[in-house]
Amino acid sequence: MSKMRVEVVSTEQLIFSGEAEFVVAPATEGEIGVYPQHVPLLTRIKPGVLRLKVPGTKEEVLVAVSGGMMEVQPSLITVLADTAIRGEDLDEARANEAKRAAEDALKHATDDMSTAKAHAALAVAIAELKTLDYLKKRAH
């Protein structure tokens, strides 16, 4: 099968650098699947699960992303994420607590700015929990 180079970078560090047979990303208009030789494009990504299919295996690398940009070239995909955490590095208890705190902040938000921050934090926590759910399903 054909493959492409994929680079996933957060503001803090390089998260993934390697080859993939395909990539599924949470674009703002819906999930987008990208195979090698895809037509070039630039898209915003929203909080969600980035899935990278590792060549020659059934393995997928899962990354929780909080948003950012994805550039697609025929043989290279670059994801510039605001924050990104590999699935195996996520902490379920911390993600659940972050979700609870964001929901609480949303209930007590008094202005547009605090409401927007709470919505953003909630979206990130949900993306992390969704990534953990993918990992659990894959283990079965």
From Swiss-Prot:
GO terms for cellular component: plasma membrane; proton-transporting ATP synthase complex. GO terms for molecular function: ATP binding; proton-transporting ATP synthase activity, rotational mechanism. Its main location: membrane. Pfam families: ATP-synt_DE, ATP-synt_DE_N. Gene3D superfamilies: ATP synthase delta/epsilon subunit, C-terminal domain, F0F1 ATP synthase delta/epsilon subunit, N-terminal. HAMAP family: ATP_synth_epsil_bac. F-type ATPases have 2 components, CF(1) - the catalytic core - and CF(0) - the membrane proton channel. CF(1) has five subunits: alpha(3), beta(3), gamma(1), delta(1), epsilon(1). CF(0) has three main subunits: a, b and c. This is ATP synthase epsilon chain. The lineage of its organism: Bacteria, Pseudomonadati, Pseudomonadota, Betaproteobacteria, Neisseriales. The gene is atpC.
